[in-house]
Every structure is written in structure tokens, then in C-alpha cells.
Amino acid sequence: MPFSRRRRVVRRRKPVRRLRRRRRRFFKRAGRGSFRVKLTRFVSITQDISKTTQFSFEITPSDFTEFATLADAFEAVRFTRAKVTVLPQQNVSNNSTSLIPAYCMFPWHKELPTVATFNGFLSIDRAKCFRGTQVGIQHYVPSTLDSIQTKGAAGYEVQSVQTKYKPTIQISGGASTVVLYTGALGMQALSDAPENAQAHYNIKIDMWCTFINQTSFNK
């Protein structure tokens, strides 16, 4: 009987399965005595489509009716984020009777220039262009312009040159008139627009804020 070598059985180990570690999400809770709310404002604007038009989404706390109701019961308020929705009131655009130009949304944290072009709007970082019949949505971080002391040839001056994002505002006499900058709307001009043609837009501004340190239950 011929000699035969038994074949060695090789047992292969199954590779270790690596599980992807899930990252836990942590949500920062509002502190005791604090209250998070969403404030909303709704405005309507009309554009002469033969002219380049701009509209700032800047807002003051007094523009929200809920702010006056809540502010007296807290020490301060912090504005954390904003969402702007542009709702065109026209849903058709053609080359004869209802030609509608495009518009764009972009972040902007200071006063708008008096003269601007639509191409200038589009060159801004994070600018988004939409059809004139299309709903536009963009999120922003609210900011304020704070005054600081500067020194020039004429001596010391106070200028509003410092941008502060997600500002915390002490609730006092002037708190309701602080200007909050978020973004802006730029609307294209059409050289061949029908005479006296207009475009209409509704704008919804949602602002999230936290009222800090409740001091009273009374208005």
C-alpha cells in the first residue's frame, strides 16, 4: 500500500469585524431660569423688475411682537440662529407678459451699499441664486456691530467696526432697538421688462433666541 501523507487541515480565522463607533450627539440644555423661543416676522415687498433692487434681512427685537411680552421677565437675551424663507407670489414666468427676473440670498453683516449690481451680489461668499418663481431658504448666524475706540490722525474716535456673532444683549431701555444683521436679498434687473412690471415677494424671518435668568412672572 503506497504511503500517503494526510493533508493538514488549515483552519482560517474569521477576520475581526470592526464596528464603526457611533458618535454620541450632545445637546446643550438651556440653564435654569432660561427660556428658548423662536420669534417670527412676516413682511411683503414689491420690486420694479426694471431696476436692481436690494432688501436687508436686518431686524430689531422690537419687530417681534413676542419679544415685548417676554423681555420684562428676564435679564438678558442671546440670539443664536436665523432662517429666512422667500416666498414669491408669482408662479409663472414667460417671455411675453409675465417675465420674472432671478433673485439671490446671501449673508450680510453690515449696512447694504446704496449702489450695487446683481453680479456683485452673486460674487459674495455663500450667495445662492433662485428663479423668480422659486421658494428660497437660507440660514444665517445673527450678529451686531459693536462700537470700539480707534485712533487716527484726528485722535481717538468711537466707530462701529467690531462684528459680534450670536450676541448676548442685556435687557434695558435700548435692548429692543439693537440692529441684528443676518443676510440680504438681491433682485435682478431686466432691460427688456414689460412697462411698469412688478414682482411680489413674502419674506418670513425666523429667529431663535434664549432668554437668560428669569427674574419675574409679571409682565
Curated annotation (Swiss-Prot):
Subcellular localization: Host nucleus; Virion
Signal sequence coordinates: none
Pfam families named in the record: Circo_capsid
Keywords, alphabetical: Capsid protein, DNA-binding, Host nucleus, Host-virus interaction, T=1 icosahedral capsid protein, Viral attachment to host cell, Viral penetration into host cytoplasm, Viral penetration into host nucleus, Virion, Virus endocytosis by host, Virus entry into host cell
Principal place of residence: host cell
Family of this protein: Belongs to the circoviridae capsid protein family.
Keyword DNA-binding attributed: yes
Keyword DNA-binding: yes
Gene: Cap
GO CC list: host cell; host cell nucleus; T=1 icosahedral viral capsid
Native organism: Human associated cyclovirus 1 (isolate Homo sapiens/Pakistan/PK5510/2007) (HuCyV-1)
Organism lineage string: Viruses, Monodnaviria, Shotokuvirae, Cressdnaviricota, Arfiviricetes
Protein name per the record: Capsid protein
Function noted in UniProt: Self-assembles to form the virion icosahedral capsid with a T=1 symmetry. This very small capsid (17-22 nm in diameter) allows the virus to be very stable in the environment and resistant to some disinfectants, including detergents. Essential for the initial attachment to heparan sulfate moieties and chondroitin sulfate B of the host cell surface proteoglycans. After attachment, the virus is endocytosed and traffics to the nucleus. The capsid protein binds and transports the viral genome and Rep across the nuclear envelope.
